[in-house]
């Protein structure tokens, strides 16, 4: 039967499980055979143990990704989730390869580190897509809130004005890391080829030291903007339980980075001095980092499985082909649009021109909600007409809404706005745009 038939959801999961079992039957004996042929030392033992953790990590992550593809009912939310879930297998396999072949570690590790910027970006997309569906005009919601001061260590800086300014700067803070990280990665590769990189060696003569500082500042600022964004909109984000999701992303990104720095400090201090089968002590530091990541990714896979579960997206009547779901996972048109829009907004700021508003009335509806723009089409009323899923509690948010099938926000039941509710005050303050307030259906 063709892939577009509705029964593909029945056979795709058993097929993936079967392929994985076949891979184990073929791969494990080969690894054992190579292990017996090689001289078994610390390096080989570390590689073999790390491989065991990789074999346990991959099925957990791929199963979560597969379940989201099978129940791909809310593209705006599930597309960034799938991209985030790919982080664990990419980190795991990448680190295992780098551990086995130290000479190419610099190349595979830089690809891994580049993906972490992509993950932070997609987590921001996930939060924004949920919020812009729930609160079509997020800027008005922010303007109605009390002024948020900066968090430590920037508490002495002037606060960002609530509304478009705060949104713009939080998005810019996250997006800058997705640009800085690939640029520093390319510089690192060039420095490695010219022999001036010196990975793991803190020295003013090595490019690695300066690139670590640049990446660290960029990463910390991106995470700071995420924390500030969550702090301001904590109440609106509560229905999707963002704390566990945020910790999953933050722990993987921060722990992997700082443990690499900590290991490099131990090497510089002479605590790690034995080279075993490695050529130099810096290679030992890189190998130790890769080994630890392989172990940590197993724990991260378990955490991701529960934090980014597919269950809230299960619907009784699901449509769509497996081919469409698979292609949607690789679609990066939203990233190109966001970066392009951000460059234009920065250019307008530099030239002293007004920035484009994030919330226009005539934005075209499509599958995703752009990171730097949103729609005024209100999916809440559409969500209220969808039968609740027995497995989920925020079903309906993130549905692909079209003007032909979605009523406008002016049809929102008046019961949603009580006389003493914040929404009623917001509507009173903005009588010209009553459909752009945040509807707290979860309260």
UniProtKB/Swiss-Prot annotation:
An example Gene Ontology CC term for this record: membrane
Biased composition (Polar residues): 369-378
Tagged with keyword Disulfide bond: no
Composition bias type Low complexity, residue spans: 399-411
Keywords on record: Membrane, Transmembrane, Transmembrane helix
InterPro entries the UniProt entry points to: Ostalpha/TMEM184C (IPR005178)
SMART domains: Solute_trans_a
Lipid bilayer topology: Multi-pass membrane protein
Family to which the UniProt record says this protein belongs: Belongs to the TMEM184 family.
PANTHER family associated with the record: ORGANIC SOLUTE TRANSPORTER-RELATED
Protein's recorded name: Transmembrane protein 184C
Species assigned in the record: Xenopus tropicalis
